[in-house]
Amino acid sequence: MWQNIIFVGLGSIVGGVSRYFISEWSRHLFPSSFPWGTFIVNIAGCFLLGLLSGFFTSHPALVYRLFFTVGFCGSFTTFSTFSFENLQLLSNKAYGLFSLNIGLSLILGILFAGLGYLMTNK
């Protein structure tokens, strides 16, 4: 158990630092009001989580899977997990749950982000 926690933590450190560097790099490379850094890490994270999930299907080394998928991708972007879970819902033909997850996540995510902002910036 502790070994798994350590691997998730180490992956999280690497993922979070990677996200920071990519966000800073993109801010200098693409100066605009569009959030390029977030966009890049979210799309790259989705691709990476898809690759890793496919790889670990045939190479089920738990600590490495935890390091890369839960730790790295989890701190690099949570959008990757959201996207992959929706892909699984589509694969299972759970179209109602797919629609519900996307709709509620987007609407409630924006509402709660706004609520949190309003609570701290009156």
Residue ranges and their predicted role:
Residues 1-122:
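Membrane-interface helix-loop junctions in multi-pass transporters/channels
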